[in-house]
Structures are given as C-alpha cells and as structure tokens.
C-alpha cells in the first residue's frame, strides 16, 4: 500500500477539488466480508474530503510486478489489466491499472485493505499524509467501511469511530481537508490496535499520518466535542508501538457519536448550541451544558467541575437573604454525582485527555466508585507504559499529577461531595451567625451608639449628649420677661450686667418718603432735573426728567448730546432747519452757555418721549 501511496503522490498536475463523482458499475467491489457502509455503486460512505487536490502528473505507467508486495507482504490479488481513469473530472493514461481491481486475493488479514477490496471512487485524494499501510488495528468492528464518495484512503477502515460512515459526517463536515489543519501528525512505527478488521498502520517517522485539514464542523454542526477531537489530534505522536485497548476506541465513539450514530440531521440545536436550550441563570446555563456533555459521554475536567459546584451553591453570596439552592431549577444530588463521575472518567486512561497542546493521556486508571450505574468507566491499566506517549501539558488536565495524588484528590473530593446538603446547612448557619454578629455591633454614630453613650456614668459625655439643665444654673424658665437681662452664659461666674439706658434722636424715627411720580418732577428745579437725567441712565426717573424738561421748553440734540433752550424766536425758520440764539447746558461744568446765530437741523432733534399717564 505504501508503494501505491508513493506512486499517487505526484506534483506536476494540480487538479482543484470538485464535486465527487463515482466510477461506473464495472468497478464493483470484489468478494469479501460484508460491510454495511459499502455502497453497491462503488461508493465508500464516510468522510467527505480528505484532501482538496489530486496530483496525478507523475504517476508511473505500470505497477512494479504482478507479484508485487505491499509493505513487504506479497499480494497475489494485485492484477495489472490495461485501463485508465475514464470518468471523473480528469483522465490520465499514466496509471493503466484499475484500482478497483486490486482485490484482496491472498492478502486477507495482512495490510490495511478492507475485505471488500480496494474501491476508489470519485476523484480520490491520496495525499502524502494518509498512510494506511501495515500493522494491525484490532478493536474496531469488521464491518468498517472506507472513506467518502469524494475521496478515499485505502487501508483505513472506518467504523463507529467516525460515525459508521453515516451521512452525519458526510453532510455536515463538507470539506474536512479544504482549509486549515485539524491534526498535525500521528506517526507510529507499528502501532497495534487489536480488533480492527480493516488494518491501519501509521508509518513510522514519516511526518504524515492522519492529516485532516480544515476548520470545519464535525458530526452535524458545531458540536462541543469537535474542538476536543481536534485537540486530541492536534500534535505529533511518535510511538514505538503498543496495544491500544478497546476502551480507548469506545471513548472516542462516545465523543463523536453523541448517542446518535445514524442521525442524518444537518442541524441539531440541542447538540450544536446547548447553551441556547439550557435553563437561564448563572449556574443554570452551565448546568445545561454539562448535561449535554454528560449525554454525549464526554467528561469535563475536575477543576471545571469544582468551579461549577461552587457557583451552583453560591450564586450571590453577598445578598443577606440568600438561603442557598435554586427553587426554580433544582439540581438533585444524584445528578451532581453523575456529572462528577463523567468528569473523573474523562481524566484517566480510559478516555483521551482533551487538552490544548494535544496528546493522549493514557495513564493508569482505577475503578469507578459507582460501577453499578456507570460500568463503562472502568478500564485497564498499563496504556501509557505500552504506548510511550508524552503526557498532556494543558493547564486544564492533571497529567502532571501522579497516580497516588490523583487518587487522593478524587477521594477527598468524593468525601466532600457526598454530603452537599449538610454543607449547605452549615454554610447557612455560618451566614446567620455572621449576620447576627454584624447586627450586634452597633454603629457608634447612629442612635444606637448614642444610647450607649447615654447609659455611661461619665458626666462629661452625658452633658455633651444631653446638654445641661439650665434650671440648675439659676435660669428662671417660667419668667415672662427677657431672659438675657438676668442670664449671661452657663459658663460664666459673673452676674449679668444691667441694661444701659439711652435715648434715640427723632431724626432716626423719620418716615419713609413716598415713591416718585410724574407729578413729583414738576416740583423739581432745572438743576435737579438735569442731575436726574445724567445720573440715572436707563431708569424710569430719567424718562420723567426728560419729559419735564420738554414740558419746560428744552429739547435734546442727538449729535451734540446736550440740552438746548430757545432764547426768543428763531431768526430763520425753514423746512429742515432753523437759526437763532440758544442756551445749552454743559454737562462737564454743569452750567448754561449762550450761542447766537446757531443752526439746528430738525432731524437731529430728539422727539419727546411718550409716557403713560400715572
């Protein structure tokens, strides 16, 4: 099979990925064991895409010989009739061998070719990273099939490990290898997994292995375990061989199948988005998510489980009325213990440790404390010693903790979680006692603190709080007269001084003058009117003074800003001006000045203000 792999990995032709098309019915499968995933048209149902490109430019013209060996295993069933790829999106005469005619022959039980024969369908993608040659992988059912109807990798049998090659992977995964890199390398030199009828050997130190690219959705949408499996396949695992028990495969089945091995739905909101369908609340959403993980057989780390337990019991510890628990969404004791069992079973050699840096954490295990309810959690020991895998370096895992320490932590956690009701009652009692002690300590600056001061025997503090009884100081509170005449101060030793007798002059008793009116300005002299006009701008009195000045024959010049008074009749009177002798008031000297033959234009004379009659 490695020879076939090397001959199909050319680089001259780079054909883009397209829609898968199966070969004609003449490429039917040969005789062999029954396989429920082997379609009668020659399609191998399973993964949708293993690689996006098919390079066939440098394929050799013929295979080596009729008795060619596949990974040092002779296979008499390798036939060499003439033929070519006549269907699909490409045609090439460089490979004259019909790949579907590479029947098993005498190679039953040897290389990784399924018992139904090597059936290549569509535009298969044989990348340099899919090596299914040599070794044996027992542990997965013999009815395993090949890969999808678009791309197929010979020698890799897919049973329930990949969803029993059902449409759940085919429809929802789309193009597993078209984008990024879901897994890097899984290289093994003779990794032996007993129980697989379709043998799988990962080539040693080849830097290849199962290289599935693309950041796509696994198992019918964005399942929570998709990223876990990506992390499981995330790094290189160079091993020297060793048995991989059935429990390891079964744990992966539990992760990937999610209790629906034959479900063909493209979208399941309960599995794809568990937080949308879980109950509300700070602890409820996480509890619903853990419930979905428990249903899928997927565990959570111990640290996360402990955090969920604390959040579940103490949602809002700062509230004084908190009594613990949740009346709307109670979580029974059996459910908590069962969630914890799933968490602990995920952290040991029975399951793969879903860490961030990848790697199989196959350490020694122990039996579950509830074997009658979860018998699948028991596993065998010695997995890590046989495989020689490096431990997981993720902070969420406990690979760096020894076996004895892990057992002690688990037993300690079990002893604490056996009595959650007693713990809640003790917590409530502690809170009640703490609240009582807090209430008993009175604030010294409130009324209760003042009462404590009043009860003391210190007279100075009592006088500061209550004051002094003035009757003890000689103050007659029943007197009808003024008290200031007889009492000066409580802290003085001298008697109160007598009141001094004095008389107030009559001028201080003058009545308030009446307010000014328009009639009042008629009694004012010229000087007082001019003073009122210039000293009270923007005031009502200024308008009254100006009105009275107009009444007495004065007018205001807007350009010179002075008051003029006519002396006699004007000498010349025209339509726009007049000329004669005038007197005006100089505001600087506050005196009247005479001007003869002075011309005054009418447009420069201010009109008389119109005032309301008061």
From Swiss-Prot:
Compartments, as annotated in UniProt: Nucleus
Domain of life where this protein originates: Eukaryota
Keywords noted in UniProt: Crown gall tumor, Nucleus, Transcription, Transcription regulation
Example of a GO MF term: mRNA binding
Biased composition (Polar residues): 364-381
Region span, Disordered: 1-46, 58-89, 361-391
GO BP: any one term: DNA integration
UniProt key word Cell cycle: no
Deletion phenotype: Impaired stable genetic transformation by Agrobacterium T-DNA.
Gene Ontology cellular-component terms listed: CCR4-NOT core complex; nucleus
InterPro entries in the record: CCR4-NOT_su2/3/5_C_sf (IPR038635), Not2/3/5 (IPR040168), NOT2/3/5_C (IPR007282)
Keyword Transcription: yes
Protein purpose: Transcriptional regulator required for Agrobacterium-mediated stable genetic transformation by T-DNA integration in host genome, but not for T-DNA transient expression.
Family the entry assigns: Belongs to the CNOT2/3/5 family.
Record text on subunit structure and interactions: Interacts with Agrobacterium tumefaciens VirE2. Binds to VIP1. Forms a complex made of Agrobacterium VirE2, VIP1, VIP2 and single-stranded DNA (ssDNA).
Protein name: Probable NOT transcription complex subunit VIP2
Source organism: Arabidopsis thaliana (Mouse-ear cress)
